[in-house]
Amino acid sequence: MTLQPTAADVGAMYDQYTSLLTDVMAGFIHVGYWEDPSSEETMEVATERMTREVGARLSSSAGQHILDVGCGTGKSAVQIANTHGVQITGITVSKSQIEEAQALYGSAVQAGQVSYQFANAMDLPFADASFDGAYAIESLVHMDDRRTALQNIARVLRPGSRLAIADLCLDAHCPNPEALARFHELFQVPPMSSGEELQELLRETGFRVLEFTDIRDNVRPVCKFLEKKALSLEGEVGEKLLEIATSMATLKELGYAFITAERI
């Protein structure tokens, strides 16, 4: 049976596993980017680099307002806000992530650099053309209606602004559907789009695709960190985390890409 997790399902999953994921990923809720996949760089260095790469693709100017679609516990928003001098509104479907983000980065919230709120990208509560850019790190993959999500993001972006995406995608043909189905179940992911499908969807929802770069080899080192953490845990949580790590390591058709698009 094809899995179609709702936003509530995804939120519940992150409510349960956020603490574990931030522990593995140095405070972030996304994988790292290793320029040299054979290096011994730490997770902290790699996850900060991933955020830096996404932030740079926005080509933003100081004072602009940026939307973080799937902000996790808020660390990426603070890093990008500090680096580029922008104001960031982060949204997530996990109530526990909102609480943690506000607790961790209260000073940045008070300073007006960042704000965090509970919201669904498929029904954004913002006015048309109210943002100067947006980014989505490993959030689109969870959405059961990516077209509606991208239409909503396009609606709230000003013409000429950028959307920077870092996310999983799938090769057009996957010879191991059973392993893929298990990955979907563990990670609350509906059927994944291929890179080509994502680019076409962006074009159909009001964007011009500027870049598509497959970086699957540069993110795969995350698997060894996930495996190490999984082996330190007992019970179902450790077993599930080990399955996720194994799936990511062995499913060669599982890609990961930087996608940069411009609102037309």
From Swiss-Prot:
GO terms for biological process: methylation. S-adenosyl-L-methionine binds at Q97, H142. One of its GO terms (molecular function) is S-adenosylmethionine-dependent methyltransferase activity. Pfam families: Methyltransf_11 (PF08241). It comes from the Eukaryota. SUPFAM superfamilies: S-adenosyl-L-methionine-dependent methyltransferases (SSF53335). It is an enzyme of class 2 (transferase). Keywords: Methyltransferase, S-adenosyl-L-methionine, Transferase. It catalyses: desmethylrestrictinol + S-adenosyl-L-methionine = restrictinol + S-adenosyl-L-homocysteine + H(+). Its EC number is 2.1.1.-. SMART domains: PKS_MT. Pathway: Antifungal biosynthesis. Belongs to the methyltransferase superfamily. O-methyltransferase; part of the gene cluster that mediates the biosynthesis of the tetrahydropyranyl antifungal agent restricticin that acts as an inhibitor of CYP51 and blocks the ergosterol biosynthesis. Within the pathway, resE uses S-adenosylmethionine to methylate position C4 of desmethylrestrictinol to produce restrictinol. The highly reducing polyketide synthase resH, the short chain dehydrogenase resG, the cyclase resF, the FAD-dependent monooxygenase resA and the enoylreductase resD are required to generate the first stable intermediate desmethylrestrictinol. This is O-methyltransferase resE. The lineage of its organism: Eukaryota, Fungi, Dikarya, Ascomycota, Pezizomycotina.
